[in-house]
């Protein structure tokens, strides 16, 4: 090899201590292309030593060979001069005037089909299509060059260099390989046609290639950390926690079916979390929940309750948790979580299911789920689009060989019908434990056709724990204010508190639930399937059956007493009907509830109630059903690269991030510091996380209704907008109404 070929440019930077003096850090030794290639191959081989049982020999070979050749294109002279500017004079090359062809595109046309087939006797033409597509698209680049441009570029800047690098003469590029690509990242036409097996093989090769490449580029040797398959440390911790207790039926079932995909329906308080963790059996697992607050609670339970230190959490606010745990290791912990490197990851579905949109860069999630177990908690809590995303994603995971467990207190029969329709039901076991005789009857329902009885609620709150759930934030604020006039022990929790204060309130309501304290908490839907709380009495606005049963689960949760009088009061005041909840489902939920009024409402009856409301034939013409069906059909027609990584959103949440002016004024120096261009990326991330803690998300539709109270322009380089609306919160008593839309402070900062 006549010339040294490099994989990346030299790294330079400023340390925090040196920033003021602007003294450059010592340069890291530049890694050669050959060493980078060997590191990635070694990373792949080490991975297969631990996780090889999940893959066929052909799959392993495809991935390793993709790791070996994917960066060959970096040997091209233009790339080498760009990362080593001193070569420009030596080779008399002005790279600024040359349009560089992406190195992945060059790598994909360096290897001939015959060379590929010679690698392994089992390789086929379909394998070549998946393989060459993974190499070609291993970075997200537009297809802007045709075969003639590739050949011309190759003759000028690549063939001599790749021959030198490989130590074997290369006289041409195999541009016919482009005809084997499964798709192009440019304008496309017609329906995307690809055999699912070939597409899934592409997902596997591309996903693992990216995983190993990202791992090595981040400075790690191993793609997976603390593999628990042999030692089963988490399983032992859970068994230790359950020691001396008989396993509940759901727990026994999941322990006996560790190798199967499952749908387990079991009431609140039946030990579903422990059942799911036992089902993992030491294998790599992802535990998903609908909300970040519930993800945080499960993460804390696994990490602190069971003492399992290798669990991580991954969502848009996870960095804040790591900073609270240990600021010194927060950056590394977050990076490892993003690399999907830990044995147990607690997350929301938003991180995992983007691969359904076939966006470049999302293949790593499908590939990782092939050798993992996926837990989906409370699937009925998702909106129709998210449910469709989950079901379509599970179909892909099932085809690739992954396993999943849906664990839920309520499972609408329409979801089982969709699973049957799309071939999921044939490959998983269903088990319903709502008839478990050991589950006590916990609820008696009273329906009120009026607004809430505030005097009665205030009176109950003097001696009992009372939970009030409203369908909208504005109604919750209104009810809270009126109750505060009647009782001092009233708190409010909803989404219009800044994250810092909302975290305090979530901690407070958990502590309140466990204490002997009496009082009232007014909340919104955010407590439905998120917080492990237990109140004596529930007053709730009417909603759809799935949400209503979730809300009931926050009352008499542990079944300490069988109610003689009603402990669930449901108010049919129509707040949210037609806007928050589909009117048809709202009315069906109300009508079917009436026959269960003023009787002991058993878990078996709740399942019957849910089945009556969500019977497929009865709701086939509802928007709920049509949206799931339409989304499932749409996913099957999506063309690869039709969506970008930023566009591949599991949940269609359109919101902006705001900070109340009073909070902004107290923290203005953080906004100034984050603009400092000499900050290290770690410090910048830390500041951005602190800033996020001082903000809240506001739905865009809500913003449109209040156009004069929120700045249109964001602050500096952040995506945070100032709002002049009053923000009310007492950090000592943890009381206040939060952000009051439409109510401006007397003094407005401009």
Task: Give the predicted meaning of each segment.
Residues 413-461:
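Interdomain hinge/linker at the junction between the two RecA-like core domains of SF2 helicases
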Residues 309-355:
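Inter-Walker segment of RecA-like/P-loop motor cores
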Residues 2-9, 13, 549-552, 558-750:
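C-terminal accessory region of SF2 helicases/translocases
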Residues 97-102, 496-499, 503, 517-565, ...:
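Conserved RecA-like helicase motor core of SF1/SF2 enzymes
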Residues 364-373, 379-434:
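Post-DEXD/H (motif II) to motif III coupling segment of the RecA-like Helicase ATP-binding lobe
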Residues 282-306, 315-318, 413-415:
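Conserved Walker A/P-loop ATP-binding site and its immediately adjacent core
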Residues 2-29, 33-230:
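Accessory nucleic-acid engagement/destabilization modules that flank
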Residues 284-295, 461-484, 492:
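Conserved strand-helix element at the start of the C-terminal RecA-like helicase core
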């Amino acid at each position: 090899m006549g010339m040294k070929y490099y994989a990346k440019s030299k790294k330079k930077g400023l340390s925090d201590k040196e920033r003021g003096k602007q003294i450059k850090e010592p340069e890291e030794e530049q890694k050669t292309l050959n060493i980078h290639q060997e590191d990635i191959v070694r990373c792949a081989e080490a991975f297969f030593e631990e996780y090889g049982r999940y893959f066929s020999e052909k799959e392993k070979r495809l991935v390793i060979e993709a790791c070996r050749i994917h960066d060959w294109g970096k040997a091209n002279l233009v790339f080498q001069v760009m990362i080593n500017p001193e070569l420009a004079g030596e080779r008399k090359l002005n790279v600024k005037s040359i349009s560089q062809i992406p190195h992945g595109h060059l790598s994909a046309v360096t290897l001939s089909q015959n060379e590929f087939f010679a690698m392994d006797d089992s390789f086929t033409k379909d394998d070549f299509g998946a393989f060459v597509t993974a190499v070609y698209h291993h970075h997200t680049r537009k297809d802007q060059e045709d075969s003639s441009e590739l050949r011309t570029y190759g003759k000028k800047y690549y063939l001599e260099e790749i021959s030198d690098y490989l130590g074997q003469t290369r006289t041409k590029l195999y541009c016919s390989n482009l005809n084997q690509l499964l798709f192009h990242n440019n304008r496309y036409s017609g329906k995307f046609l690809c055999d699912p097996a070939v597409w899934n093989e592409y997902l596997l090769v591309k996903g693992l290639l990216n995983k190993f490449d990202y791992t090595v580029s981040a400075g790690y040797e191993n793609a997976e950390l603390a593999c628990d398959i042999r030692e089963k440390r988490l399983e032992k911790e859970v068994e230790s926690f359950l020691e001396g207790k008989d396993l509940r039926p759901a727990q026994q079932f999941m322990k006996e079916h560790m190798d199967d995909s499952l749908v387990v329906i079991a009431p609140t308080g039946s030990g579903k979390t422990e059942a799911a963790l036992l089902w993992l059996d030491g294998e790599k697992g992802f535990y998903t929940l609908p909300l970040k607050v519930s993800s945080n609670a499960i993460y804390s339970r696994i990490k602190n309750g069971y003492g399992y230190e290798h669990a991580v959490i991954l969502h848009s606010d996870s960095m804040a948790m790591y900073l609270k745990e240990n600021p010194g290791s927060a950056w590394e912990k977050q990076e490892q979580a993003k690399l999907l490197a830990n044995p147990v990851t607690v997350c929301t579905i938003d991180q995992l299911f983007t691969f359904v949109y076939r966006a470049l860069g999302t293949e790593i999630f499908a590939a990782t789920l092939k050798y993992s177990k996926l837990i989906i908690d409370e699937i009925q809590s998702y909106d129709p689009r998210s449910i469709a995303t989950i079901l379509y994603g599970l179909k892909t995971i099932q085809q690739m060989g992954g396993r999943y467990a849906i664990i839920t207190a309520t499972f609408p029969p329409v979801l089982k019908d969709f699973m049957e329709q799309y071939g999921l039901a044939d490959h998983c076991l269903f088990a319903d434990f709502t008839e478990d005789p050991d589950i006590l009857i916990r609820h008696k329902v009273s329906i009120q056709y009026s607004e809430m009885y505030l005097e009665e609620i205030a009176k109950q709150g003097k001696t009992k724990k009372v939970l009030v759930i409203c369908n909208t934030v504005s109604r919750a604020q209104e009810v809270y204010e009126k109750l505060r006039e009647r009782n001092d022990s009233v708190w409010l929790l909803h989404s219009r508190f800044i994250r810092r204060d909302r975290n305090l309130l979530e901690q407070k309501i958990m502590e309140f639930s466990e204490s002997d304290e009496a009082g009232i908490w007014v909340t919104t839907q955010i407590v439905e399937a998120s917080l492990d709380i237990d109140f004596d009495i529930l007053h709730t606005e009417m909603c759809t059956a799935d949400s209503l049963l979730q809300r009931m689960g926050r009352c008499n949760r542990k079944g300490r007493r069988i109610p003689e009088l009603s402990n669930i009061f449901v108010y049919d005041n129509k707040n949210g009907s037609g806007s928050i909840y589909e009117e048809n489902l709202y009315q069906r939920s109300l009508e079917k509830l009436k026959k269960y009024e003023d009787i002991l409402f058993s878990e078996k009856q709740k399942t019957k109630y849910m089945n009556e409301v969500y019977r497929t034939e009865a709701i086939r013409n509802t928007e709920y059903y049509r949206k799931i069906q339409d989304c499932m059909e749409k996913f099957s027609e999506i063309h690869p690269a039709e969506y970008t990584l930023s566009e591949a959103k599991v949940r269609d949440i359109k919101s902006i991030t705001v900070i109340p002016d009073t909070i902004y004024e107290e923290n203005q120096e953080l906004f100034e510091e984050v603009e400092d261009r000499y900050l290290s990326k770690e410090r910048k991330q830390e500041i951005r996380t602190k800033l996020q803690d001082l903000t809240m998300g506001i739905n865009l539709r809500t913003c449109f209704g209040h156009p004069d109270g929120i700045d249109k322009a964001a602050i500096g380089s952040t995506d945070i907008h100032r709002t002049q609306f009053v923000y009310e919160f007492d950090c000592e008593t943890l009381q206040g109404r939060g952000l009051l839309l439409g109510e401006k402070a007397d003094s407005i900062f401009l």
